[in-house]
Amino acid sequence: MKKTSKMIYLILLLFINLSCIKQQSNEKGRNNSELVSTSKTDTLKFTSGIRAIFQDSKGNYWLGSHNEGVSYYNGKTFEYFATNEGLTDNQIRSIEQDKNGKIWFGTAKGVSVYDNGKLINYPTNLSYPRYEWNETSGNLWFNAGAEDGINRFDGINMNYLIFPKPQNKNTDNTDNTYGVTGISKDKEGKVWIATYAALFNYDGKMVHIFDKEKLNLKDNERLHIRSVLADSKGRIWIGNNGIGVLLLDRNSTINFSEKHHLIHPTSKRNGNKSEPGTLEHPFAIEEDSEGNIWFGDLYTGAWKYDGKTMTNYNTIDKNLKSQMIWTIYKDNSNNLLFGMAEGGVYKFNGKSFDKIF
């Protein structure tokens, strides 16, 4: 009997050890030992759209596509790598650089990090979700694909964190999930996280929820958030697919698009195509070096708010070949770059747009 009990104990101990090893392997990533091989071109070959733009500390540009992987531009040539070279997924949603110079990619199926020609992958670890958001320093934040949570790298491990959900609330639509669509840090270091169904704010200690009720939406309006920006004045701009831009300033929220008469009178305030001259589907928001707020709309293109008036550049600048803007990015020289759905990158020169990639 004692031998049987001892054998069962050893088997359980072995199982626990193997589980811990598996968890550590997922948290610390999977190393692709072979060097990443890439193709090269003189011009950017992406056609599926540019969803992410990043300029690293050396001045190189990294461009993330909708479904073709990543391109690296060193000022002369474009190099490419995708799932064939070890990338977690070909849909790139965010790009960052850490303090050690490594380049991180948030993809539709996890996170990849590029380091000296090698890729290390961190698939979203659904087996070990974490509900406690313990404060750590030097965090990198990434979406978790379609999952209801967010990936956070704390400098050692990648952790999959679960959002606290609003209690007894209906998200109004079955396609509204808590998958991350945007991340922005404010001047106090708080992290604002946009999901389809709600906005979350993490202050280092607690996670605060901004749902339909807290954002004072009308009965015929629903949340379907696609972008968020914490600007230099402490205001939070929320891009909502269907009802336009919401502006959260301290404890009050207004519908910015409605205030500026940029929602069509016949709009159903959903995902349907909007009329020209409206701002109902903002997929991208950014602030330029002069404090102007820029919006990229799914159907009506580039908008600028200078604090008083709104300007729609797609109606006055014929250089913009595409209406849909996936991302707006401010580079190291304070140039504003626009990633378009047709696969090009445009720079605003102060008056009009020039295609640079």
List where the protein language model places each region.
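Carboxylate-rich, polar loop motifs that coordinate divalent cations or form catalytic acidic clusters
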Residues: 2-357
